[in-house]
Structure formats: C-alpha cells, structure tokens
Amino acid sequence: MNETINEQEVLLLRRKLDLLLRTGKLLMESAADTNRIERNMKRVAAYLGIPEEKLHIDIRWTMLMVNVSDEKHSFSKFQKCEKHGINMEAISKISKLSWRAIEQDYSLDKYEEELEKIARQERNYTPYVVAICTGFACGGFCKLFGGDWIAFLITAICTFVGFRTRARCIEFGINVYMSIAISAFLCTCLAYAFSFSGLSSTPYHPLLACTLYIVPGVPLINFVDDMIDNHLLVGITRAANTVMMVGGMAFGIAFALRLLVMSDVTIDQKFSELSMVPHDAYWVRLWDSPLYLMCRDVCCGWWL
C-alpha cells in the first residue's frame, strides 16, 4: 500500500515539474529575461506546493533544469527550448496566470488548460500586417532623420520585402543567421536600385534605414539585464546570439554594396554627406514619432 501511495506521489510530482518547466519554456521562448523566468517559475512552484528550500532551478538559453530534493530523495527534470522569438503578450499572460492560480487555487488541470491556451494562442495580427507595420516603422525612422516622404515609402517597401523574405527563409528551415543575411542583402539591393529612380531628394536614406528591423534590440536588452543580474552564462549566450545576428545583417549589407556599387560611385562619401537633421515642421514630426513607435511595438510583439 505504501509503495502504491509513493508511486502516486512520484507521478504527481513529475506532473508538477512538467508544468513548471513548460511555464519556463514559454517564457524563455518568448524572450523573457532570466530574472523574470526565475521569478515566475518560483511563483508557480509556490502554487504547486513545492517548498522553495527544496527547489533548485537552472536556466540556460536552450535548456531548463529543475530539481526537487530532500535528505532522502531527489527528482530532476529537463526541458529543451528550441524556438526563440518575441512575444510580450505571452510573457504578460503567464505572469498574470501565476498570480491568478494562487489567488483562485486552480487545480492542476485548470492551470494546464490555461497554459495551453497561452501556448496555442494566435497572434492578434497576421504576418503581413506585422510586415507592413515593420515597414512603416523603418520608414518613420528614415523620415525622422532627414528623409522625405518618398524615401519613407521606399524604405517601407524594402523593409516589407526583406521582412517577409526572412520569415519565408525561416519557414523553409534555413539557418536563422543566414536568413538575416539574405533579407539584409535583398533590402539593400532594392534600396540601392531605388536610389537611381530620381523619385526622392534623399535617395540614400533608405539604404541606412531599410534594415533597422533586423537590429536585435530585445536580445541586446536581455543580455545587459542578465549580466547585471549575475546570470552570466545566459547573458553571454544572448550576447553571442546578438553578435551573430548583427554579423549576419552586416554581411548581407556589405555583400550587396560590394556586388552592386559601381566604381564611379563612392558610396562612403555619399553616406558622409547625408544630413540627419529633420527638415519638416514640428507638427509633422509630432506624427512621425508616434507612427514609428506604434509600428515598432507591433513588430516587436508588444501588441501581438
């Protein structure tokens, strides 16, 4: 009888650890910082009735490890983290779920059901809407720093094409960093081709702004945050990931310019001559900034 009871307790503990790890996995794959992941996992462990003094959590970029041990027993479980993206809504909902589970004393089935809803929830915006907003965000940045409205439109078009190209490459199973390089190459080629159209009085501003969507702002912030919070291993891994993303972007841009720029065009001098001072009235810039910020937030996942 005791053996049966012990076996049931072990199965229950394994289920609790599984729910705990699935919670941490969702947070890690949604680009939460390590401190937030640890804080939420400990809160969920408290809801699950796991004593904090017996709980040991190890968080890595690609692996989560949880151990519950006392003087006689030790149970460990691992969870692989494979797909890293940005989903701020998922992070927010998991945090609210952990508090709600404690306050309303959720059953394990209820908590698992709510967790699955968060994991399977579709984004509020379709991929093409996100791509359009990303284009407007980069176009708004171009407009804020001296570009005209035609340059804004050119930047938006180039960014849209590059954003969808990167998404398609990832869907086809191409390496993430190679996908970034391909999209940066295509963006730069399009922007350079538009510079000969004569449509814009600031033809080289789109070259500088069309690949801004690739800049890994969230990974960079998480890297700094993790290093400050003394999560050194995860922080260094995030830093390496950030460097690889920037390297892929730089390679794509440099390769495009090396391949396309004609010998009689000194592109470095063209860039050094660019004016970054806005030439619009203040009321125009008053609309530029919210447009840039709103579209940037959509493409980064704040409202997704």
PLM regions and their residue ranges:
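Alpha-helical transmembrane segments and their membrane-interface boundaries
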Residues: G85-L304
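Soluble N-terminal domains of membrane-associated systems
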Residues: M1-D109
